[in-house]
């Protein structure tokens, strides 16, 4: 192959040149030896002393179906301003990297498509740890390039980490549809730390944040971003309503079974799922259940009625609707819904903020499926750092690849 063409393929530019090629057929390996024609090195201020030369090797894209290595003697330069030595930059690789820019770029693409370090490792013919380092470098590269000026509406949510009660707190850009950051833990201090990952000017520019009614999320947001309006997420409110319905159903089912009545047996899915998800037979059966004077029927009606709160035209209409719904709940003779109505009333300002911003955490919930796939592919994570790097790599919409 012509030397100039090979230099173009490898990303080698003056003062560097290809000095030779060694091919090991048995190992299926190609080593491209690169030499430097420069003897003097300068920065913007002065000439730098060459303290010594160090042999370095970088993995490159395969040539002729052989594992390809770039090998070069790189000068170690003494910086008189700091008194420290540092390796001279080479055009085909980033600082401190063991791979060429083109190989790292290809590796990032492979990892994005495989979702699994084990599969990526096999395809790239790299070790698991090497693939992990490439992924972490890509995330740090992307975070350094990322701009946050347009982040005005965010979502806060918590996700499970390891088995048990380990959680992470996650912040998403609701307009940009991306994860912004992840921190370990979901207490107030961790939520404050999550907010503080945004630069102060950007943090103060956030207009609203969607979240559940957990006190840690609320207190952390009010401490770190007091100007941001808190909007309670409709899907978490819906989950609270479903939990209330299920508590009523379980208590009533226990009472009925004690009397030999199996009316509610096997009906849990009917009460908690949307009607559109029921089969024709299940829907007909459910219609008959609703006609019976059951406590569970009344609870289900309160839950479904509340869904109309979110389609009100504005906050005043939303307030009027909530007052009517609350009165019905208080008169329902269902202690679970009486307690829920009173609890929601304490969060009314945050519920009404929905009409000003119309934001939900549906996007954060959507990331759940991706995160669960990552956890399944990894068969769990050994550390939070691994978990964070995977989430940001796949969900943060970062510019991950080296500049060629």
Residue ranges and their predicted role:
Residues 1-90:
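Short, conserved DNA-binding cores of transcription-related domains
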Residues 237-258:
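Short alpha-helix plus adjacent loop in nuclease-associated cores
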Residues 92-95, 204, 228, 252-257:
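Short, polar/flexible loop-turn hinges at active-site or ligand-entry regions and domain interfaces
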Residues 127, 138-142, 213, 228, ...:
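The DNA-recognition helices of helix-turn-helix-type DNA-binding domains
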Residues 36, 163-166, 173-174, 184, ...:
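Acidic/histidine-rich catalytic cores and adjacent linkers
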Residues 53-165, 204, 210, 223, ...:
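Short, positively charged, Gly/Tyr-enriched micro-motifs
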Residues 90-98, 174-189:
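Glycine-rich phosphate-binding "P-loop"
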């Amino acid at each position: 192959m012509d030397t100039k063409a090979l230099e173009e393929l490898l990303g080698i530019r003056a003062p560097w040149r290809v000095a030779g090629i060694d091919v090991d057929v048995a190992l299926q390996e190609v080593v491209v030896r690169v030499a430097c024609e420069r003897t003097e090195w300068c920065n913007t201020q002065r000439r730098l002393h060459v303290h010594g030369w160090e042999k370095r090797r970088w993995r490159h894209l395969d040539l002729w179906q052989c594992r390809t290595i770039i090998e070069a003697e790189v000068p170690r330069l003494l910086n008189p301003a700091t008194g420290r030595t540092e390796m001279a930059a080479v055009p085909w690789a980033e600082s401190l990297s063991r791979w060429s820019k083109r190989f790292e770029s290809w590796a990032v693409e492979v990892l994005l498509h495989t979702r699994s370090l084990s599969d990526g490792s096999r395809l790239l013919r790299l070790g698991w740890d090497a693939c992990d380092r490439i992924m972490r470098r890509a995330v740090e590269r992307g975070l350094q390039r990322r701009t946050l000026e347009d982040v005005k509406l965010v979502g806060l949510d918590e996700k499970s980490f390891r088995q048990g009660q380990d959680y992470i707190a996650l912040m998403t850009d609701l307009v940009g549809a991306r994860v912004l950051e992840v921190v370990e833990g979901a207490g107030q201090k961790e939520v404050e730390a999550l907010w503080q990952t945004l630069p102060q000017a950007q943090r103060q520019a956030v207009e609203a944040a969607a979240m559940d009614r957990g006190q840690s999320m609320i207190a952390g947001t009010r401490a770190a971003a007091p100007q941001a309006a808190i909007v309670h997420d409709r899907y978490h409110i819906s989950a609270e309503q479903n939990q209330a319905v299920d508590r009523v159903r379980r208590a009533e089912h226990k009472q009925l079974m004690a009397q030999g009545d199996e009316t509610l047996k096997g009906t849990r899915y009917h009460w908690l799922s949307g009607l559109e998800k029921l089969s024709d037979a299940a829907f007909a059966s459910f219609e008959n259940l609703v006609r019976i004077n059951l406590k569970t029927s009344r609870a289900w009606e309160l839950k479904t009625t509340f869904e109309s709160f979110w389609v009100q035209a504005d906050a005043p209409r939303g307030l009027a609707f909530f007052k009517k719904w609350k009165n019905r709940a208080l008169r329902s003779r269902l202690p679970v819904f009486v307690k829920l109505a009173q609890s929601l009333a304490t969060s009314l300002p945050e519920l009404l903020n929905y009409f000003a911003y119309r934001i939900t955490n549906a996007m954060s919930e959507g990331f759940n499926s991706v995160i669960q796939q990552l956890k399944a592919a990894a068969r769990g994570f050994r550390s939070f750092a691994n978990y964070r790097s995977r989430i940001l790599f796949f969900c943060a919409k970062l510019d991950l690849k080296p500049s060629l």
